[in-house]
A protein has these predicted regions:
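Positively charged n-region of N-terminal signal peptides that target proteins for export
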Residues: 1-5
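Solvent-exposed, non-transmembrane regions of membrane-associated and secreted proteins
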Residues: 8-237
């Protein structure tokens, strides 16, 4: 084989390798999305089974009590946005597997990911996480549910494009009982030790999304704040 043919083969191999590397993130994210879809279907079957209605009502009441307690204690255990690894609630006691309390959907950036209780490393590999010591994502007056996620983790695009979300955009949370819709009213960049944005606002029903910023540098935090609205008919499932 002459030198020219060898160079052509090597060039073709480099092109093939480059193409594979370019396609790999998209393919990996597609696989992640399909897995999320499959797990969501199982979740829906579980929460819509009439046999589970009573126990899920008990869970809902328990979380309402926890949210009231967090409010009354003025979130006195808040320290750092990413330090709340262990959930105070074991969802398996209520028949919910994988520690998934629901799903968050953000149409503007075309994502839908599970929400897991507890901001530990294992959970953050799987999707978004609820920060313990903030309100659980069931809505209600005097609540601020803080939901965190990586920008990207492995094969999953999570809050990668969070900075594309703007005022007026909708965020939907489908927990084990109902769908909640929130409208974005503020985005902001904060320091990692700034916990003031995670605090409950008197009389409000809000959620706060948080992730590292800037992307791949991670010296600050990017947050999105949204208030509860009821004038929508679009369903998550």
């Amino acid at each position: 084989m002459n030198k020219r043919k060898i160079l052509i083969i090597v060039a073709i191999l480099f092109i093939l390798i480059g193409t594979i590397l370019l396609c790999f993130p998209s393919a990996s994210n597609y696989i992640y999305e399909k897995n999320v879809e499959t797990e969501k279907e199982k979740f829906v079957v579980k929460i819509t089974d009439e046999q589970n209605e009573n126990i899920l009502d008990k869970l809902y009441k328990k979380l309402q009590e926890e949210n009231q307690k967090i409010y009354e204690e003025k979130q006195n255990k808040l320290v750092d946005p990413f330090s709340y690894e262990q959930s105070a609630i074991d969802l398996s006691e209520y028949g919910i597997e994988n520690n998934v309390i629901g799903y968050i959907s953000i149409p503007k950036i075309n994502i839908e990911v599970p929400i897991l209780l507890g901001a530990n490393t294992a959970n953050m590999k799987k999707g978004a996480v609820h920060l313990t010591e903030t309100s659980y994502p069931i809505g209600g007056v005097n609540t601020n549910s803080v939901i965190a996620a990586h920008r990207v983790y492995g094969k999953a695009t999570l809050f990668r494009y969070i900075d594309k979300i703007g005022v007026g955009d909708k965020i939907r949370i489908r927990n084990f009982k109902e769908e909640l819709t929130y409208e974005v009213y503020e985005t902001k960049i904060i320091n990692p030790d700034d916990i003031s944005e995670l605090e409950i606002e008197e009389g409000q029903d809000i959620i706060t999304l948080i992730t590292c910023h800037p992307y791949r540098i991670n010296t600050q935090r990017y947050i999105v704040k949204a208030k509860r609205v009821w004038n929508t008919t679009l369903c998550l499932f």
